[in-house]
């Protein structure tokens, strides 16, 4: 795995993969071009070609990209060829929605367990899962060898929960808590804060 590729480039690869999957599902063509992908995604064709060039040559001049092949290659680059088990921490409204979301499986992820510290939620069925007490978090994470977790909890408990997850072996975290998390080197953190996204857009209004 190359470590000198800008994170912003890595961040665009899942967008390309998603659009290639849509093209395949439409079933109208076997090949596409950087121009077509750019038009569909609002990204310049030059940017797409530059991004892909970090990982090799995937297309042919005059022919473009074979959709199936490029999809397979991007899946391999993103390590999505096998399914990743994911732990969800927080069984509130957001955790409930995540547990019922069917879009994870199609894209390489399976919600394997969900935790909460509320005794009224523990034991509740969410989708195909039973909410587990957070006191069992380390034991279950280690037993299932889970490397990916989603935090759907309030900000004041996000850091201590992050510490517990990392100590249990989690290497990648998606946090919905509106707070910066401190993690050791080698642990990836991404944030999803809709308020931040709205505030960014209001600058242009």
Residue ranges of model-derived segments:
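HTH-adjacent hinge/linker in prokaryotic transcriptional regulators
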Residues: 31, 35, 40-83
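NAD(P)-binding Rossmann-fold cofactor-contacting core
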Residues: 105-127
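Glycine-rich Rossmann-fold phosphate-binding loop(s) that bind the pyrophosphate
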Residues: 91
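Extreme N-terminal segment that seeds HTH/winged-HTH DNA-binding domains in transcriptional regulators
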Residues: 1-29
């Amino acid at each position: 795995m190359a470590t000198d590729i800008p994170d912003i480039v890595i961040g665009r690869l899942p967008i390309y993969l998603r659009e290639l999957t849509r093209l395949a599902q439409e079933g109208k063509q076997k090949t596409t071009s950087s121009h077509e992908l750019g038009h569909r995604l609002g990204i310049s064709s030059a940017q797409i070609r530059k991004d892909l060039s970090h990982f090799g040559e995937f297309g042919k001049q005059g022919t473009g990209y074979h959709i199936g092949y490029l999809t397979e290659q991007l899946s391999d680059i993103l390590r999505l060829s096998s399914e990743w088990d994911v732990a969800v921490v927080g069984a509130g409204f957001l955790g409930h929605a995540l547990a019922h979301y069917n879009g994870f499986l199609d894209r390489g992820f399976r919600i394997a367990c969900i935790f909460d510290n509320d005794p009224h939620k523990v034991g509740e069925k969410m989708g195909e899962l039973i909410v587990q007490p957070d006191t069992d978090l380390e034991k279950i994470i280690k037993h299932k060898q889970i490397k990916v977790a989603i935090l759907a909890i309030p900000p004041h408990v996000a850091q201590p929960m992050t510490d517990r997850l990392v100590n249990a072996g989690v290497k990648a975290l998606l946090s919905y808590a509106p707070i910066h998390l401190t993690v050791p080197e080698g642990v990836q953190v991404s944030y999803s804060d809709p308020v931040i996204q709205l505030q960014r857009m209001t600058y242009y209004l």
